[in-house]
């Protein structure tokens, strides 16, 4: 006899109706969805049983090692923090299953509210909630408590406790509510009732209606419960556990399903039984269901192009890889279904990488009211046989007037403008969807197929609609030497970099692996000029920087010639916001010069002398917390990576990655940069960039690649060399001309004069300029400006000096044999190699770098070759740099931590006879290693970013590489003390 199925009690039925209504559509969509058997627990159990224990575990961390502690029911555990957190979550979920039922969705959407796509955004940020609470508690908006909430980033003025909550809005609200709470004990409002009220709150727009919902909460909650409710509304939980942990504990396949659907409700309702696993097509993505796309991995810090290509898993049968330009836009997926009832016959869906629905902007239909900024123009984009399709790509902004991509910051503005374009005008800026993958076609899931097959499907199903929807082009490459020319091209065009792809790879949802690799130029030429700009606004920090200005709004003067009384006197346009590179002394100096002169920014009455972004639309983008008259302010000297367009600032341009250099105490406010002066600087910098090639390094150590003369010189076996062997004074170079541009650096140093003498002694002719004569050998071992200029021309190979030595030595070894010129080896002999010669010269050595024509006499070189023959160990190891880059990619950068502050540096230390300086240098080296940097003793090593010199060694600084900054140990110490990377020029040689 089968067991009786337990039926939901009356309270459970009431709560189910309260949260989901009598929704037949839900039952049809989720026919097997679970229903709880009993009432959900009180809201406060979320923080008493889950949030607080998790945060307490976070604070404690792992217990220090010591005597073995007692284990068992009455002893202490020695679990790691991660294990302890999992235990807490497992207990909470097990308790829910036992006492409530299998529908965990009501709790899950409160635990990870930022992943809940079913509930609309509340439209409530900190200040809006503060205004609601002021009305709720019926306190004066001019009272101290009201000001504490409205100015939550400011240090507390009411009592000492307020100072500790500067930057913590929910904590500040607790202080205000705790003295006015209707309930001192924990309330009885259930999780289901809270969800019902939050659903209503998300549908309301007016402040008065929002106050009524908050009154309902306040009547049944105490101050602590209200504090957690506010965190849920703001979607700022910070409880010490990620959504991945919760999903993994809920069900083994929960993360997989979330990756293909981005639907928390579906995860909870379809995977309520841990014993029932996803199978087959259930693990694949679906039409009109947002999925988590595949991501590109970050290149290894210090990895060469050769190593990057090796990670793309090329093999002897297929050594190809694809090179694509990395686009500066927003990752977007397009879903299309044929629908006879939709205007135009097709239904569209657009989702960002963060699962935000953009169909309202880019369009749901081809025609009618819901034809958006893109769909109205792509009627002919799909083949006649395409019934449905899912495309993966990048939404970018394209400027039709210059026919070029525009920075990401302009995308939404361009889309809104294009939405109103009814005539298909070919001017201005517009959204352009660049498609690089097809993951679903005509009811067929394509993710298991190779990228090459998916590309064929894409090209057969989609046709370009010029500057609306285009298939993103790629270059098929076969050697790592093809990467640098492509990278140089995109750098010259101010692009973001490259993406390298393995055409043999399948599509992996929500995975960042080596099948797609980003390659970015880390050390590009900076904007080139320091900018002295006036400070007009200040922003209060949060967390440990709460209560004081942590960043500043800088502006450009409109008219430096204006006099007091003129309309333009002191008038400024906002330009950029800077918060990096300040030390405690810098903050103190700025505070000392401006204290008492700051005014709170009133959005209803903004100062007329300061215009912000959005001014013409009566908006206030990047609004500061406080402002200051330019005549009372200070001038900051700042540098940046580049200038880019942005409607967030009044000037419509801003600095990318600005950093503070120094406080210009020698400049008056009216000597700060004006709008016209900046235009002149910008034009000058752009002119210089056209004249001089951008210098860059690839992450930590870009591999120098070698090339030789376009016209082949005499090679092994040539009958033109008939002179018999004559020892060191041979005629091996007879008939060749040598243009030696630099000294030799590797494997030993030789001066330019010594090299020229060696060439002459062996029959060669020395010239002092390049030409197109067929037997000219150009020699260099350093990338000087004249060498870089020759590379840019791309007409001649450039040979390393070691080839001269190798050729002479080989002919000494072959005493008595017919003398011959040693064939070029790409890695050892070539400094710059023309693409046309690549395959020919690669044939001169095997895969491990062992030459077919040259004897290996050097032990270290032999050891290196033998080491390369060892098969790589198949192992999975933690990639720290990739992990940190992913955190930054998700907006959770660790750049404020000391263990990350030097992560992008490689530092060379000079030696000194001064024992005191040597000790300081050792300590500085330890700081750099702890901060994630690399240490080297060779200043000429690839990728060196900083050179630390002893005090007084300024005379020899000229030999430091162009891209290496010269500093003293004082810079390292100061960065360490301030927990931030400071500007190098302030701490040179000390």
Swiss-Prot record:
InterPro entries named among the record's database cross-references: Adenylation_DNA_ligase_IV, BRCT_dom, BRCT_dom_sf, DNA_ligase_ATP-dep, DNA_ligase_ATP-dep_C, DNA_ligase_ATP-dep_cent, DNA_ligase_ATP-dep_CS, DNA_ligase_ATP-dep_N
Catalytic activity: ATP + (deoxyribonucleotide)n-3'-hydroxyl + 5'-phospho-(deoxyribonucleotide)m = (deoxyribonucleotide)n+m + AMP + diphosphate
Stretch list, region Disordered: 57-84
Domain BRCT: 728-821, 900-989
Binding annotation for Mg(2+) 2: 496
Keywords: ATP-binding, DNA damage, DNA recombination, DNA repair, Ligase, Magnesium, Metal-binding, Nucleotide-binding, Nucleus, Repeat
EC number of the protein: 6.5.1.1
Top-level lineage group: Eukaryota
Keyword Magnesium: yes
Gene Ontology, cellular component aspect: chromatin; DNA ligase IV complex; nucleolus
Protein known as: DNA ligase 4
Organism field: Phaeosphaeria nodorum (strain SN15 / ATCC MYA-4574 / FGSC 10173) (Glume blotch fungus)
Lineage of source species: Eukaryota, Fungi, Dikarya, Ascomycota, Pezizomycotina
């Amino acid at each position: 006899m089968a067991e009786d199925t337990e039926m939901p009690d009356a309270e459970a039925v009431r709560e189910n109706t309260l949260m989901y209504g009598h929704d037949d559509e839900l039952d049809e969509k989720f026919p097997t969805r679970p229903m709880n058997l009993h009432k959900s627990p009180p809201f406060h159990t979320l923080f008493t049983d889950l949030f607080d224990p998790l945060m307490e575990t976070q604070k404690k961390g792992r217990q220090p090692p010591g005597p073995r502690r007692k284990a068992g029911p009455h002893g202490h555990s020695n679990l790691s923090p991660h294990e302890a957190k999992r235990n807490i979550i497992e207990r909470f979920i097990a308790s829910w299953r036992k006492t409530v039922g299998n529908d965990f969705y009501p709790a899950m959407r409160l635990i990870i509210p930022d992943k809940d796509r079913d509930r609309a955004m509340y439209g409530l940020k900190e200040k809006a909630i503060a205004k609601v609470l002021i009305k709720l508690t019926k306190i004066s908006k001019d009272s101290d408590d009201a000001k504490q909430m409205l100015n939550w980033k400011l240090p507390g003025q009411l009592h000492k406790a307020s100072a500790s909550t500067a930057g913590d809005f929910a904590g500040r609200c607790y202080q205000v509510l705790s003295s006015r709470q209707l309930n001192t004990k924990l309330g009885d409002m259930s999780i289901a009732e809270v969800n019902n009220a939050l659903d209503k709150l998300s549908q309301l727009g007016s402040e008065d209606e929002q106050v009524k919902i908050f009154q309902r909460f306040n009547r049944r909650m105490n101050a602590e419960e209200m504090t957690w409710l506010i965190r849920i509304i703001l979607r700022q939980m910070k409880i010490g556990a990620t959504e991945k942990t919760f999903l993994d504990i809920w069900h083994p396949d929960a993360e997989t399903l979330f990756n293909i659907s981005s639907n928390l409700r579906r995860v909870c309702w379809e995977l309520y039984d841990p014993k029932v696993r996803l199978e087959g097509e259930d693990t694949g993505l679906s039409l009109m269901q947002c999925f988590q796309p595949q991501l590109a991995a970050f290149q290894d810090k210090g990895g060469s192009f050769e190593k990057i290509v090796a990670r793309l898993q090329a093999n002897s049968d297929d050594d190809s890889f694809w090179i694509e330009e990395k686009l500066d836009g927003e990752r977007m997926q397009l879903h299309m279904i044929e629908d006879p009832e939709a205007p135009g016959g097709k239904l569209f869906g657009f989702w960002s990488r963060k699962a935000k629905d953009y169909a309202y902007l880019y369009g749901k239909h081809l025609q009618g009211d819901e034809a958006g900024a893109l769909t109205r123009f792509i009627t002919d984009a799909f083949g006649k046989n395409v019934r449905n399709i899912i495309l993966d790509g990048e939404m970018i902004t394209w400027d039709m007037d210059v026919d070029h991509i525009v920075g990401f910051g302009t995308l939404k503005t361009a889309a809104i403008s294009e939405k109103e374009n009814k005539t298909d005008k070919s001017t201005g800026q517009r959204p352009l969807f660049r498609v690089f993958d097809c993951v679903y076609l005509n009811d067929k899931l394509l993710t298991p197929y190779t990228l090459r097959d998916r590309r064929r499907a894409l090209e057969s199903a989609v046709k370009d609609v010029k500057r609306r929807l285009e298939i993103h082009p790629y270059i098929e490459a076969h050697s790592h030497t093809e990467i640098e020319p492509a990278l140089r091209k995109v750098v010259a065009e101010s692009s973001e970099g490259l993406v390298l792809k393995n055409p043999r790879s399948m599509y992996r949802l929500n995975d960042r692996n080596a099948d797609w690799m980003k390659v970015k130029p880390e050390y590009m030429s900076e904007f080139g000029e320091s900018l002295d700009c006036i400070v007009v606004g200040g922003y209060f920090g949060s967390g440990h920087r709460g209560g004081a200005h942590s960043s500043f709004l800088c502006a450009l003067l409109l008219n430096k010639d204006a006099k007091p009384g003129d309309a333009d006197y002191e008038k400024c346009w906002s330009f950029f916001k800077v918060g990096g590179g300040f030390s405690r002394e810098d903050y103190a100096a700025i505070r000392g010069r401006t204290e008492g002169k700051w005014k709170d920014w009133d959005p209803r009455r903004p100062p007329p002398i300061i215009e912000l972004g959005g001014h013409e639309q009566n908006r206030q983008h990047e609004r500061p917390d406080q402002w200051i008259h330019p005549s009372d302010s200070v001038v900051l000297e700042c540098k940046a990576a580049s200038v880019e367009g942005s409607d967030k600032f009044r000037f419509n341009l801003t600095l990318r990655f600005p950093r503070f250099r120094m406080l210009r105490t020698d400049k008056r406010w009216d000597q700060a940069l004006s709008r016209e002066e900046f235009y002149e600087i910008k034009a000058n910098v752009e002119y210089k960039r056209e004249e001089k090639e951008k210098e860059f390094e690839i992450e930590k150590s870009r591999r120098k690649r070698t090339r030789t003369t376009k016209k082949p010189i005499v090679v092994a076996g040539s009958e033109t060399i008939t002179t018999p062997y004559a020892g060191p004074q041979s005629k091996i170079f007879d008939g060749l001309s040598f243009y030696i541009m630099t000294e030799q650096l590797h494997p030993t140093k030789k001066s330019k004069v010594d090299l020229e003498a060696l060439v002459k002694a062996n029959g060669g002719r020395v010239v002092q300029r390049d030409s197109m004569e067929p037997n000219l050998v150009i020699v260099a071992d350093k990338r000087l400006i004249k060498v870089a200029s020759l590379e840019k021309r791309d007409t001649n190979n450039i040979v390393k000096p070691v080839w001269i030595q190798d050729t002479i030595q080989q002919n000494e070894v072959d005493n008595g044999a017919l003398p011959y010129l040693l064939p070029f080896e790409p890695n050892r002999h070539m400094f710059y190699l023309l693409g046309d010669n690549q395959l020919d010269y690669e044939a001169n050595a095997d895969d491990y770098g062992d030459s077919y024509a040259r004897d290996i006499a050097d032990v270290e070189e032999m050891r290196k070759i033998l080491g390369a023959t060892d098969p790589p160990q198949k192992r999975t190891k933690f990639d720290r740099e990739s992990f940190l880059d992913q955190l930054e990619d998700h907006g959770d950068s660790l750049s404020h931590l000391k263990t990350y502050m030097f992560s992008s540096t490689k530092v060379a230390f000079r030696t000194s006879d001064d024992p005191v300086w040597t000790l300081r240098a050792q300590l500085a080296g330890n700081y750099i290693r702890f901060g994630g940097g690399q240490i080297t003793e060779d200043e000429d090593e690839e990728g060196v970013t900083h050179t630390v010199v002893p005090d007084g060694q300024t005379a020899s600084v000229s030999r430091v590489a162009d891209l290496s900054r010269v500093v003293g140990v004082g810079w390292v110490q100061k960065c360490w003390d301030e927990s931030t990377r400071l500007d190098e020029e302030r701490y040179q040689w000390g």
